[in-house]
Protein backbone atom coordinates (compact mmCIF):
# COMPACT_ATOMS: atom_id res chain seq x y z
CA UNK A 1 0.00 0.00 0.00
CA UNK A 2 1.45 3.41 -0.91
CA UNK A 3 2.44 5.82 1.84
CA UNK A 4 -0.19 8.57 1.93
CA UNK A 5 1.67 11.04 4.12
CA UNK A 6 5.15 12.50 4.38
CA UNK A 7 7.80 10.67 6.42
CA UNK A 8 10.79 12.95 5.81
CA UNK A 9 11.76 15.77 8.18
CA UNK A 10 10.77 19.32 7.29
CA UNK A 11 14.41 20.37 7.51
CA UNK A 12 15.49 17.86 4.88
CA UNK A 13 12.51 18.59 2.63
CA UNK A 14 13.17 22.32 2.73
CA UNK A 15 16.84 21.76 1.90
CA UNK A 16 15.85 19.61 -1.07
CA UNK A 17 13.46 22.27 -2.34
CA UNK A 18 16.04 25.04 -2.03
CA UNK A 19 18.54 22.91 -3.94
CA UNK A 20 16.13 22.35 -6.84
CA UNK A 21 17.14 23.94 -10.13
CA UNK A 22 13.99 23.22 -12.12
CA UNK A 23 11.47 26.09 -12.19
CA UNK A 24 8.29 25.67 -10.18
CA UNK A 25 4.95 27.45 -10.50
CA UNK A 26 2.82 28.45 -7.50
CA UNK A 27 -0.93 28.23 -7.98
CA UNK A 28 -4.07 28.29 -5.85
CA UNK A 29 -7.58 27.08 -6.53
CA UNK A 30 -10.81 26.23 -4.77
CA UNK A 31 -14.23 24.86 -5.55
CA UNK A 32 -17.36 24.45 -3.50
CA UNK A 33 -18.95 21.16 -4.57
CA UNK A 34 -20.26 18.01 -2.92
CA UNK A 35 -17.68 15.35 -2.01
CA UNK A 36 -19.38 12.22 -0.71
CA UNK A 37 -16.29 10.63 0.85
CA UNK A 38 -13.62 13.25 1.57
CA UNK A 39 -11.10 10.71 2.93
CA UNK A 40 -11.22 8.52 -0.19
CA UNK A 41 -11.05 11.64 -2.33
CA UNK A 42 -8.03 12.83 -0.36
CA UNK A 43 -6.14 9.53 -0.57
CA UNK A 44 -6.64 9.28 -4.32
CA UNK A 45 -5.48 12.84 -4.90
CA UNK A 46 -2.49 12.53 -2.58
CA UNK A 47 -0.86 9.78 -4.61
CA UNK A 48 -1.54 11.51 -7.92
CA UNK A 49 -0.27 14.87 -6.67
CA UNK A 50 2.85 13.19 -5.29
CA UNK A 51 3.54 11.61 -8.68
CA UNK A 52 3.60 15.15 -10.16
CA UNK A 53 5.94 16.48 -7.42
CA UNK A 54 3.27 18.78 -6.01
CA UNK A 55 4.08 20.60 -2.77
CA UNK A 56 1.68 22.72 -0.76
CA UNK A 57 -1.42 22.77 1.39
CA UNK A 58 -4.72 21.14 0.38
CA UNK A 59 -7.90 21.05 2.46
CA UNK A 60 -10.75 18.73 1.55
CA UNK A 61 -14.24 18.61 3.06
CA UNK A 62 -17.70 17.50 2.09
CA UNK A 63 -18.27 21.05 0.83
CA UNK A 64 -15.28 21.10 -1.56
CA UNK A 65 -11.55 21.68 -1.94
CA UNK A 66 -9.16 24.55 -1.16
CA UNK A 67 -5.52 24.39 -2.29
CA UNK A 68 -2.34 26.46 -2.41
CA UNK A 69 0.43 24.49 -4.12
CA UNK A 70 3.55 24.60 -6.23
CA UNK A 71 4.74 22.11 -8.84
CA UNK A 72 7.45 21.83 -11.50
CA UNK A 73 6.44 24.11 -14.33
CA UNK A 74 6.85 21.31 -16.87
CA UNK A 75 4.16 19.34 -14.99
CA UNK A 76 1.56 22.11 -15.12
CA UNK A 77 -0.37 20.84 -18.14
CA UNK A 78 -0.40 17.28 -16.78
CA UNK A 79 -1.66 18.65 -13.47
CA UNK A 80 -4.49 20.53 -15.19
CA UNK A 81 -5.51 17.39 -17.07
CA UNK A 82 -5.53 15.43 -13.83
CA UNK A 83 -7.47 18.00 -11.82
CA UNK A 84 -10.08 18.57 -14.52
CA UNK A 85 -10.71 14.81 -14.77
CA UNK A 86 -11.17 14.15 -11.04
CA UNK A 87 -14.78 15.32 -10.92
CA UNK A 88 -17.08 17.06 -13.42
CA UNK A 89 -17.33 20.00 -10.98
CA UNK A 90 -13.59 20.64 -11.46
CA UNK A 91 -13.62 20.67 -15.26
CA UNK A 92 -11.86 23.84 -16.49
CA UNK A 93 -11.57 25.14 -12.93
CA UNK A 94 -9.88 28.54 -12.74
CA UNK A 95 -6.33 28.32 -11.39
CA UNK A 96 -4.85 31.44 -9.81
CA UNK A 97 -1.22 31.67 -10.93
CA UNK A 98 1.00 33.48 -8.41
CA UNK A 99 1.94 37.04 -9.35
CA UNK A 100 5.34 37.30 -7.69
CA UNK A 101 6.78 33.81 -7.69
CA UNK A 102 10.25 32.36 -7.18
CA UNK A 103 8.94 28.80 -7.02
CA UNK A 104 10.09 28.41 -3.42
CA UNK A 105 6.68 28.76 -1.79
CA UNK A 106 6.30 25.20 -0.41
CA UNK A 107 8.52 22.19 0.25
CA UNK A 108 6.11 19.46 1.38
CA UNK A 109 2.63 18.26 0.42
CA UNK A 110 0.11 18.41 3.25
CA UNK A 111 -3.39 17.23 2.40
CA UNK A 112 -5.97 17.24 5.18
CA UNK A 113 -9.64 16.34 5.55
CA UNK A 114 -11.58 18.99 7.47
CA UNK A 115 -15.16 19.72 8.44
CA UNK A 116 -15.09 22.83 6.22
CA UNK A 117 -12.60 24.04 3.61
CA UNK A 118 -12.92 27.45 5.28
CA UNK A 119 -13.73 27.56 8.99
CA UNK A 120 -16.83 29.76 8.96
CA UNK A 121 -18.59 28.95 12.25
CA UNK A 122 -21.97 28.94 10.48
CA UNK A 123 -24.47 26.71 12.27
CA UNK A 124 -27.68 27.46 10.42
CA UNK A 125 -29.44 24.74 8.44
CA UNK A 126 -31.23 27.36 6.32
CA UNK A 127 -27.95 28.86 5.05
CA UNK A 128 -27.32 27.99 1.39
CA UNK A 129 -23.67 28.58 0.40
CA UNK A 130 -24.51 28.11 -3.27
CA UNK A 131 -26.56 31.34 -3.33
CA UNK A 132 -23.66 33.72 -3.76
CA UNK A 133 -23.23 37.29 -4.90
CA UNK A 134 -22.35 38.29 -8.45
CA UNK A 135 -18.81 37.94 -9.74
CA UNK A 136 -16.96 41.11 -10.69
CA UNK A 137 -14.19 41.08 -13.27
CA UNK A 138 -11.25 43.50 -13.14
CA UNK A 139 -12.85 46.26 -15.21
CA UNK A 140 -16.07 46.02 -13.20
CA UNK A 141 -14.09 46.21 -9.96
CA UNK A 142 -12.55 49.50 -11.05
CA UNK A 143 -15.95 50.86 -12.03
CA UNK A 144 -17.37 49.90 -8.64
CA UNK A 145 -14.46 51.60 -6.88
CA UNK A 146 -15.59 54.86 -8.48
CA UNK A 147 -19.23 54.34 -7.51
CA UNK A 148 -20.17 56.39 -4.40
CA UNK A 149 -22.97 53.92 -3.61
CA UNK A 150 -20.54 51.03 -3.25
CA UNK A 151 -18.65 49.71 -0.22
CA UNK A 152 -15.63 47.44 -0.60
CA UNK A 153 -15.17 44.98 2.27
CA UNK A 154 -11.90 43.17 2.94
CA UNK A 155 -12.64 39.64 4.18
CA UNK A 156 -9.06 38.87 5.16
CA UNK A 157 -7.36 38.95 8.55
CA UNK A 158 -6.08 42.20 10.02
CA UNK A 159 -2.43 41.40 9.26
CA UNK A 160 -3.32 40.86 5.59
CA UNK A 161 -5.20 44.15 5.34
CA UNK A 162 -2.34 45.97 7.08
CA UNK A 163 0.11 45.52 4.20
CA UNK A 164 -2.30 45.98 1.28
CA UNK A 165 -5.93 46.55 0.32
CA UNK A 166 -8.20 48.12 -2.27
CA UNK A 167 -8.58 51.88 -2.12
CA UNK A 168 -10.86 52.90 0.78
CA UNK A 169 -11.77 49.29 1.58
CA UNK A 170 -13.40 48.56 4.93
CA UNK A 171 -11.40 46.41 7.33
CA UNK A 172 -13.26 43.87 9.46
CA UNK A 173 -10.82 43.86 12.40
CA UNK A 174 -10.47 40.22 13.36
CA UNK A 175 -8.02 37.33 13.24
CA UNK A 176 -10.46 34.72 11.94
CA UNK A 177 -13.03 34.39 9.18
CA UNK A 178 -15.56 32.84 11.56
CA UNK A 179 -15.45 36.01 13.69
CA UNK A 180 -15.66 38.30 10.68
CA UNK A 181 -18.92 36.98 9.23
CA UNK A 182 -21.27 38.15 12.02
CA UNK A 183 -19.13 41.26 12.50
CA UNK A 184 -19.46 42.45 8.91
CA UNK A 185 -23.22 41.86 8.84
CA UNK A 186 -23.54 43.98 11.98
CA UNK A 187 -21.13 46.67 10.76
CA UNK A 188 -23.06 47.17 7.52
CA UNK A 189 -26.56 46.77 8.94
CA UNK A 190 -27.45 50.37 8.04
CA UNK A 191 -26.06 50.07 4.50
CA UNK A 192 -28.32 47.44 2.98
CA UNK A 193 -29.18 49.81 0.14
CA UNK A 194 -25.51 50.03 -0.90
CA UNK A 195 -23.60 47.83 -3.30
CA UNK A 196 -21.46 45.54 -1.14
CA UNK A 197 -18.29 44.25 -2.84
CA UNK A 198 -16.39 41.58 -0.93
CA UNK A 199 -12.87 40.42 -1.68
CA UNK A 200 -10.08 38.21 -0.35
CA UNK A 201 -6.83 36.69 -1.59
CA UNK A 202 -8.07 34.10 -4.07
CA UNK A 203 -11.85 34.22 -3.81
CA UNK A 204 -12.81 31.39 -1.45
CA UNK A 205 -13.58 33.51 1.63
CA UNK A 206 -15.40 36.31 -0.16
CA UNK A 207 -17.54 33.85 -2.12
CA UNK A 208 -18.89 32.32 1.07
CA UNK A 209 -19.12 35.76 2.69
CA UNK A 210 -21.27 37.00 -0.18
CA UNK A 211 -23.68 34.11 0.40
CA UNK A 212 -23.75 34.95 4.11
CA UNK A 213 -24.61 38.58 3.40
CA UNK A 214 -27.44 37.60 1.06
CA UNK A 215 -28.68 35.21 3.75
CA UNK A 216 -28.76 38.17 6.15
CA UNK A 217 -30.92 40.37 3.97
CA UNK A 218 -28.40 42.30 1.88
CA UNK A 219 -29.54 42.59 -1.73
CA UNK A 220 -26.76 44.03 -3.89
CA UNK A 221 -23.83 41.78 -3.03
CA UNK A 222 -20.81 41.16 -5.24
CA UNK A 223 -17.43 39.47 -4.92
CA UNK A 224 -14.20 39.86 -6.86
CA UNK A 225 -13.71 36.93 -9.22
CA UNK A 226 -10.51 35.10 -8.33
CA UNK A 227 -9.79 37.53 -5.52
CA UNK A 228 -6.85 39.91 -5.45
CA UNK A 229 -4.60 37.53 -7.40
CA UNK A 230 -6.86 37.25 -10.44
CA UNK A 231 -7.86 40.92 -10.30
CA UNK A 232 -4.26 42.13 -10.41
CA UNK A 233 -3.34 39.70 -13.19
CA UNK A 234 -6.28 40.65 -15.40
CA UNK A 235 -5.90 44.38 -14.74
CA UNK A 236 -2.27 44.22 -15.85
CA UNK A 237 -3.07 42.09 -18.90
CA UNK A 238 -5.83 44.48 -19.96
CA UNK A 239 -3.86 47.65 -19.29
CA UNK A 240 -6.23 48.78 -16.53
CA UNK A 241 -5.20 50.85 -13.51
CA UNK A 242 -4.43 48.50 -10.61
CA UNK A 243 -6.43 49.89 -7.70
CA UNK A 244 -5.07 47.53 -5.06
CA UNK A 245 -2.49 49.36 -2.97
CA UNK A 246 0.51 47.66 -1.39
CA UNK A 247 1.27 43.97 -0.97
CA UNK A 248 -0.97 40.91 -1.16
CA UNK A 249 -0.24 38.69 1.86
CA UNK A 250 0.04 34.98 1.00
CA UNK A 251 0.19 31.95 3.30
CA UNK A 252 3.43 30.39 2.12
CA UNK A 253 7.16 31.00 2.37
CA UNK A 254 6.89 34.18 0.25
CA UNK A 255 4.49 35.84 2.74
CA UNK A 256 3.54 38.42 0.14
CA UNK A 257 3.19 39.40 -3.51
CA UNK A 258 4.05 42.94 -4.51
CA UNK A 259 1.03 44.49 -6.25
CA UNK A 260 1.99 48.17 -6.16
CA UNK A 261 5.14 50.01 -5.11
CA UNK A 262 3.33 51.55 -2.15
CA UNK A 263 4.49 50.49 1.32
CA UNK A 264 1.57 51.27 3.62
CA UNK A 265 2.59 49.39 6.79
CA UNK A 266 5.26 49.97 9.42
CA UNK A 267 7.77 47.93 11.37
CA UNK A 268 6.11 46.80 14.59
CA UNK A 269 9.30 47.41 16.53
CA UNK A 270 10.60 50.80 15.41
CA UNK A 271 7.80 52.24 13.25
CA UNK A 272 9.78 52.73 10.04
CA UNK A 273 7.96 52.20 6.73
CA UNK A 274 8.01 48.44 6.06
CA UNK A 275 5.67 45.67 4.92
CA UNK A 276 7.81 42.54 5.34
CA UNK A 277 6.20 39.91 7.55
CA UNK A 278 8.24 37.34 9.38
CA UNK A 279 7.74 34.75 12.10
CA UNK A 280 9.66 35.15 15.34
CA UNK A 281 12.75 32.95 15.26
CA UNK A 282 11.94 31.64 18.72
CA UNK A 283 10.22 28.32 17.96
CA UNK A 284 8.29 28.60 21.21
CA UNK A 285 6.78 31.86 19.97
CA UNK A 286 6.67 31.88 16.14
CA UNK A 287 4.58 35.05 16.14
CA UNK A 288 3.83 36.79 12.87
CA UNK A 289 4.85 40.45 12.77
CA UNK A 290 6.34 43.12 10.52
CA UNK A 291 10.06 43.67 10.97
CA UNK A 292 12.46 45.96 9.10
CA UNK A 293 16.02 44.81 8.23
CA UNK A 294 17.56 46.93 10.98
CA UNK A 295 15.33 45.45 13.68
CA UNK A 296 15.84 41.97 12.24
CA UNK A 297 19.56 42.43 12.87
CA UNK A 298 19.11 44.05 16.26
CA UNK A 299 16.67 41.43 17.57
CA UNK A 300 18.17 38.51 15.62
CA UNK A 301 14.85 37.87 13.87
CA UNK A 302 12.89 37.84 17.11
CA UNK A 303 9.85 39.84 18.16
CA UNK A 304 11.21 40.88 21.56
CA UNK A 305 14.18 40.93 23.91
CA UNK A 306 12.71 37.95 25.74
CA UNK A 307 12.59 35.86 22.59
CA UNK A 308 16.07 36.99 21.55
CA UNK A 309 17.41 35.75 24.87
CA UNK A 310 15.52 32.50 24.40
CA UNK A 311 17.08 31.67 21.02
CA UNK A 312 20.53 32.16 22.53
CA UNK A 313 19.95 29.25 24.91
CA UNK A 314 21.21 25.77 24.01
CA UNK A 315 18.74 24.02 21.72
CA UNK A 316 18.08 21.25 24.24
CA UNK A 317 17.08 23.83 26.85
CA UNK A 318 14.84 25.61 24.37
CA UNK A 319 13.04 22.34 23.60
CA UNK A 320 12.57 21.63 27.29
CA UNK A 321 11.10 25.07 27.89
CA UNK A 322 8.77 24.69 24.91
CA UNK A 323 7.56 21.44 26.41
CA UNK A 324 6.75 23.37 29.58
CA UNK A 325 9.14 21.51 31.85
CA UNK A 326 10.39 24.71 33.45
CA UNK A 327 7.62 27.28 33.57
CA UNK A 328 4.69 25.66 31.81
CA UNK A 329 2.65 27.23 29.02
CA UNK A 330 3.06 30.78 30.31
CA UNK A 331 6.67 31.20 29.19
CA UNK A 332 5.50 32.96 26.04
CA UNK A 333 2.48 35.13 25.49
CA UNK A 334 0.69 34.03 22.32
CA UNK A 335 -2.08 36.62 22.56
CA UNK A 336 -3.64 37.63 19.27
CA UNK A 337 -3.82 41.25 20.30
CA UNK A 338 -1.19 43.83 19.47
CA UNK A 339 1.05 45.20 22.15
CA UNK A 340 2.19 48.80 22.14
CA UNK A 341 5.13 48.59 24.50
CA UNK A 342 7.85 50.79 23.11
CA UNK A 343 10.49 49.26 20.91
CA UNK A 344 9.35 45.68 21.38
CA UNK A 345 5.69 46.17 20.46
CA UNK A 346 4.53 43.64 17.92
CA UNK A 347 1.51 42.08 16.28
CA UNK A 348 1.12 38.78 18.07
CA UNK A 349 -0.65 36.79 15.38
CA UNK A 350 0.68 33.32 14.72
CA UNK A 351 0.43 31.54 11.39
CA UNK A 352 -0.59 28.02 12.21
Curated annotation (Swiss-Prot):
Annotated EC: 1.14.-.-
Residue ranges with Basic and acidic residues bias: 315-328
Domain of life: Bacteria
Disordered, as annotated region: 315-352
UniProt cross-references to Pfam families, sorted A to Z: Rhodanese, Rhodanese_C, UPF0176_N
Keywords: Oxidoreductase, tRNA processing
PROSITE patterns: RHODANESE_3
Family, as annotated: Belongs to the TrhO family.
Database matches in PANTHER family: TRNA URIDINE(34) HYDROXYLASE, UPF0176 PROTEIN YCEA
Protein name: tRNA uridine(34) hydroxylase
Organism field: Photorhabdus laumondii subsp. laumondii (strain DSM 15139 / CIP 105565 / TT01) (Photorhabdus luminescens subsp. laumondii)
Gene from which this protein is expressed: trhO
Amino acid sequence: MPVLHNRISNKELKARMLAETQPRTTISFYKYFNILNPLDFRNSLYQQFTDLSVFGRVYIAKEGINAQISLPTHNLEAFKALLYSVDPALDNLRLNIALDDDGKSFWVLRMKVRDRVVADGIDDETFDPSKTGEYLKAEQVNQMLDNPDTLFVDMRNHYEYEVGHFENAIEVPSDTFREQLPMVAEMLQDNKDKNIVMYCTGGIRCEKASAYMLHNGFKNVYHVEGGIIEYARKAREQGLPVRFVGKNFVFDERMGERISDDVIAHCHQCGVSCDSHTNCKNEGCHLLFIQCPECATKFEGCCSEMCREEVRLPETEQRARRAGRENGAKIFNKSRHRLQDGLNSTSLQSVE
